[in-house]
């Protein structure tokens, strides 16, 4: 159980693909790996005061990367694609609604 909504939503994803989804009112976040869709929905609604229609999640495996001393590994992440109700926007992204 993750009690605080700010422990569920870790940070927004800043990428070309996430900015492209802003036109469809879909926002992308890195979330806690143990969070489920219901917890993510409630956290976004509490933090940003918006209505969430749908939450899709993606578990991304960490990439293996070469370092000076051998092979390293990036950590795995969980992403949430959050669809908002028409008319609701989140201003932190600086997208079409901002």
From Swiss-Prot:
<comment type="function">
    <text>One of the early assembly proteins it binds 23S rRNA. One of the proteins that surrounds the polypeptide exit tunnel on the outside of the ribosome. Forms the main docking site for trigger factor binding to the ribosome.</text>
</comment>
<keyword id="KW-0687">Ribonucleoprotein</keyword>
<dbReference type="GO" id="GO:0005840">
    <property type="term" value="C:ribosome"/>
</dbReference>
<dbReference type="GO" id="GO:0003735">
    <property type="term" value="F:structural constituent of ribosome"/>
</dbReference>
<dbReference type="InterPro" id="IPR012677">
    <property type="entry name" value="Nucleotide-bd_a/b_plait_sf"/>
</dbReference>
<dbReference type="Pfam" id="PF00276">
    <property type="entry name" value="Ribosomal_L23"/>
</dbReference>
<keyword id="KW-0689">Ribosomal protein</keyword>
<keyword id="KW-0694">RNA-binding</keyword>
<protein>
    <recommendedName>
        <fullName>Large ribosomal subunit protein uL23</fullName>
    </recommendedName>
</protein>
<keyword id="KW-0699">rRNA-binding</keyword>
<dbReference type="InterPro" id="IPR013025">
    <property type="entry name" value="Ribosomal_uL23-like"/>
</dbReference>
<comment type="similarity">
    <text>Belongs to the universal ribosomal protein uL23 family.</text>
</comment>
<dbReference type="GO" id="GO:0006412">
    <property type="term" value="P:translation"/>
</dbReference>
<dbReference type="InterPro" id="IPR012678">
    <property type="entry name" value="Ribosomal_uL23/eL15/eS24_sf"/>
</dbReference>
<comment type="subunit">
    <text>Part of the 50S ribosomal subunit. Contacts protein L29, and trigger factor when it is bound to the ribosome.</text>
</comment>
<dbReference type="GO" id="GO:1990904">
    <property type="term" value="C:ribonucleoprotein complex"/>
</dbReference>
<dbReference type="GO" id="GO:0019843">
    <property type="term" value="F:rRNA binding"/>
</dbReference>
